[in-house]
């Protein structure tokens, strides 16, 4: 089974992504990964950190001459700001008798962060892990960690492209109270135009509404969330399974999206709108075609019974406003128990456009795992042979002659 994990802290020396059981022969380059990481930094409303937080990439293992080897892949993203944090984030014990060390740990970046931010991992993490301050929690819970996931997912994206010819696309539906985009669903041919939009929007009117929301929030010292949509065309029938809850592909995709920092809701297809419809209006009726079976609608978002049904996969994720609010919220100082205002770390006004790129990454990883579970293969060539045989079977299974 394809597996992935990440390690590292926001201001630590580096982030590391590890991918296991990726077949041999998948093309991948440092430029491929750098491109996806640059897309993650996109977006109107990002903070100053994006301007100098370069991604210093090193491909450590599992890749040779531009191809995966079949062995574990390790990718490191160095922190170009590490020299400023060597004392504060040192893995070695500190000598607090040293005046320079004591000074660094008593003020500025090193000062204890005892006032947890509402909406963040600070409070529960400090209690759960018995930390006296929030630094050990916020360093790992920071969305900076998603850079490692995006790096790992680049390999998965290339695998999906090589095996199925599919691409994973996202766009922003709305930011804050902006008028939501209700136009036609984009295709991968629209990706350059979407990425060229400051808010990764499909439509100029929607873009202007989103930018207006961000400008207003910035002036008011506030932050914003929003909704992103992920679309994948061309998936075969039968990825995932109905046989158990954990095998259902929609459950896996929802879990992966909910695992992104600040995501508070996930919708498959028309999702919550389906709950307001009658059954006769909610489901995608099937029609016979010369090629087999098609649908008149795609309200299910390409998933039925936990399996892909051959229609376009469509998912939405709702991101809450960033919890580091410039006009600090009320909290409790964990060192004294007294009322206080929350700590303020450098952050964005809005990170919804970037969340779409991270959502693409998680969908790509889950889909790559589903493809390998269905088709197997120790090499890319073997997986492609298995897929070709299955596609031949499906074509025959749905062949009844002219409609």
UniProtKB/Swiss-Prot annotation:
Q: Which residues bind NADP(+)?
A: 40, 46
Q: Which GO terms describe its biological process?
A: amino acid biosynthetic process; aromatic amino acid family biosynthetic process; chorismate biosynthetic process
Q: What does this protein do?
A: This reaction introduces a second double bond into the aromatic ring system.
Report the family membership. Answer: Belongs to the chorismate synthase family.
Tell me which PROSITE patterns the record gives: CHORISMATE_SYNTHASE_1, CHORISMATE_SYNTHASE_2, CHORISMATE_SYNTHASE_3
Q: Which gene encodes it?
A: aroC
Q: Where is this region: Disordered?
A: 277-307
Question: One GO MF term, please?
Answer: chorismate synthase activity
Going by the record, the broad EC class of this enzyme is lyase
Coiled-coil segments, which residues? Answer: none
Self-association state and partner proteins as the record states: Homotetramer.
| Record carries keyword Lipid metabolism | no
**Involved pathway(s):** Metabolic intermediate biosynthesis; chorismate biosynthesis; chorismate from D-erythrose 4-phosphate and phosphoenolpyruvate: step 7/7
The record lists the lineage as: Bacteria, Bacillati, Actinomycetota, Actinomycetes, Mycobacteriales
The transmembrane residues are none
UniProt-listed SUPFAM superfamilies: Chorismate synthase, AroC
Q: Does the keyword Lyase apply?
A: yes
Q: What is this protein called?
A: Chorismate synthase
Give the EC number(s) under which this enzyme is classified: 4.2.3.5
What does the note under cofactor report? Reduced FMN (FMNH(2)).
Q: Which GO terms describe its cellular component?
A: cytosol
Q: Which residues bind FMN?
A: 140-142, 261-262, 305, 320-324, 346
Question: Mind listing the UniProt keywords for this protein, alphabetically?
Answer: Amino-acid biosynthesis, Aromatic amino acid biosynthesis, FAD, Flavoprotein, FMN, Lyase, NADP
Reaction(s) catalysed by this chain, per the record, are: 5-O-(1-carboxyvinyl)-3-phosphoshikimate = chorismate + phosphate
Q: Which InterPro entries does this UniProt record tie to the protein?
A: Chorismate_synth (IPR000453), Chorismate_synth_AroC_sf (IPR035904), Chorismate_synthase_CS (IPR020541)
Biased region (Basic and acidic residues) positions are: 277-298
């Amino acid at each position: 089974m394809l597996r992935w994990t990440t390690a590292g802290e926001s201001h630590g020396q580096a982030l590391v992504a590890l991918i296991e059981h990726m077949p041999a022969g998948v093309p991948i380059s440092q430029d491929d990964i750098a491109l996806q990481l640059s897309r993650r930094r996109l977006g109107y409303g990002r903070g100053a950190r994006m301007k100098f937080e370069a991604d210093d990439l090193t491909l450590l293992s599992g890749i040779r001459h531009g191809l995966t080897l079949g062995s574990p892949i390790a990718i490191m993203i160095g922190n170009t700001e590490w020299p400023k944090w060597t004392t504060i984030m040192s893995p070695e014990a500190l000598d607090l008798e040293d005046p320079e060390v004591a000074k660094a740990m008593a003020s500025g970046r090193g000062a204890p962060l005892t006032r947890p931010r509402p909406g963040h991992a600070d409070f529960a993490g400090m209690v759960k892990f018995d930390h006296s301050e929030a630094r050990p929690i916020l360093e790992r819970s920071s969305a900076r960690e998603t850079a490692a996931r995006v790096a790992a997912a680049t390999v998965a994206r290339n695998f999906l492209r090589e095996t199925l010819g599919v691409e994973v696309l996202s766009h922003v539906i709305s930011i804050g109270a902006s008028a939501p985009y209700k136009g036609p669903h984009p295709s991968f041919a629209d990706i350059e135009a979407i990425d060229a939009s400051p808010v990764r929007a499909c439509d100029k009117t929607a873009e202007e509404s989103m930018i207006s929301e961000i400008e207003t929030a910035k002036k008011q010292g506030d932050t914003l969330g929003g909704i992103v949509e992920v679309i994948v065309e061309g998936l075969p029938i039968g990825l995932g399974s109905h046989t158990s809850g954990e095998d259902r592909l929609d459950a896996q995709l929802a879990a992966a999206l909910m695992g992104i920092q600040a995501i508070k809701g996930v919708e498959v297809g028309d999702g919550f709108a389906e709950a307001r419809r009658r059954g006769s209006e909610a489901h995608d009726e099937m029609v016979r075609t010369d090629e087999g079976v098609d649908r008149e609608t795609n309200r299910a978002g390409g998933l039925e019974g936990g399996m892909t049904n051959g229609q376009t996969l469509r998912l939405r994720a709702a991101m809450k406003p960033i919890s580091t609010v410039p006009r600090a919220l009320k909290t409790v100082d964990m060192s004294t128990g007294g009322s206080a205002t929350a700590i303020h770390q450098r952050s964005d006004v809005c990170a919804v456009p970037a969340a779409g790129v991270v959502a693409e990454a998680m969908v790509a990883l889950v889909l790559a795992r589903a493809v390998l579970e269905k088709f197997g293969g120790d090499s890319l060539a073997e997986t492609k042979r298995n897929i070709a045989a299955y596609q031949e079977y499906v074509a025959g299974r749905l062949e009844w002659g002219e409609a």
